[in-house]
């Protein structure tokens, strides 16, 4: 037995060296030392075969005695030759085993005592827990108590929730990796004396380890199986989920429902006990719902459901759902199977319904331009486009030709009459056949008037004539205003890629409409603004109203229609120098016209 202080600087130099040398002179001690030295010499020869045998037996024995006495560090506190440092391990003096030459802290082996008198054998020798386990029955219970105090078996997988602020945002926390924890419950058992005593890091580099210690090291250092790891992880997930639900019921659901007089505590129970009961039952039902029966494991949706239930049941606006849960009107097995939309508070559900409704209304299915064929007994037959007008079989070609000639003659006579009327001065504007009745509504200024629209033309050729359809019900509702300096360049630029329909807006003949019409023109013209109208159909991108005074035609109108539409100007009504008018510009997405 040897004793030394916990320092690497005095390794091999202790105050009992003289006593040991004196013991070696005795016969029993010589016999034991001789066996130890011989075994050390054999191991040294195997590790270094290139070293030549020494002739001086006494010198060899002297050197090996020092090395054997020095031994190696292996203590229950985890100290070993690789990590031992006197600055870190301040556990006091160390004692050396007379059986395997291992160094151990006296306090670690005696459960905090400074002496080892109780562990000495009859012949005043010290043996470690591997050489004589019967001397260390007291360590098993003490180490178990130490593990239970120092190690938190149930690490919070979801982490603690900050409940100081009821208005805080719900934070969804990720799972904590089990590798980040110090020790698992199974690994804590490895501290027991009869289990993992010799660590793997200590076993491979020791020169004087006994055969028994090597066997124990090999048998006890088996790696845990994947199944054990999964079951441990699953257990921690379930424990922390139940803990999270317990906090949810005790701090939010039960107090809020009691305060709103929607729930009363049963007789003989308090908030904590009833919350724990609810939390346990809720976790059990959630576990059953998320259990993969085929593989016997939890699905990944388990953690997502825990967070979803927690965040929605914590919501103060979800008071009705909380009351249904605690009163039992909503069974827990149905609660765990509800999706996020069903768990949301009424305001969120109403908002989602409105959003879905708008999405469905704006949903457009584009009709492909490619020809469609269908397989029949005659082969592939082309299906004509339904949107194209079909020929009326009641009319023959001759009747259609005669009908066209009559219509042409009537059109010529109408044009002559129109020119004759236009030459005559008239105080009112002429309403042609293409005029569309409309109502102008300006809520921002509180102005309303009735009038009509005359179609002027389009910047591009359209697939079909939609100038009437684009106006819809004729109600022109002003949504806002836009600076003319911004709108004019935009319309000019977009006219290259989009079709723009142009109309001229006139008021009705009644005096009230004319007065309101003049106020609208003056307001927009003086402030340099144009009015934005709510689009009437799904293929309309923008709808603008542009003012004009003094009989001038806006430059943007000339830029959009161009010189090739100069004939369209004949359809403008004659404007006096002080006359006011409005022009409507409708930007159309042709790909949505069917």
UniProtKB/Swiss-Prot annotation:
Domain TFIIS central: 254-365
Biased composition (Basic and acidic residues): 36-63, 155-164, 209-231
Biased composition (Basic residues): 191-208
PROSITE patterns associated with the record: TFIIS_CENTRAL, ZF_PHD_1, ZF_PHD_2
Residue ranges, compositional bias (Acidic residues): 165-175
Annotated InterPro entries: SPOC_C, TFIIS_cen_dom, TFIIS_cen_dom_sf, Zinc_finger_PHD-type_CS, Znf_FYVE_PHD, Znf_PHD, Znf_PHD-finger, Znf_RING/FYVE/PHD
Location in or out of the cell: Nucleus
Family: Belongs to the BYE1 family.
Misc: Present with 892 molecules/cell in log phase SD medium.
Biological function: Negative regulator of transcription elongation.
Name the UniProt record assigns to this protein: Transcription factor BYE1
Native species: Saccharomyces cerevisiae (strain ATCC 204508 / S288c)
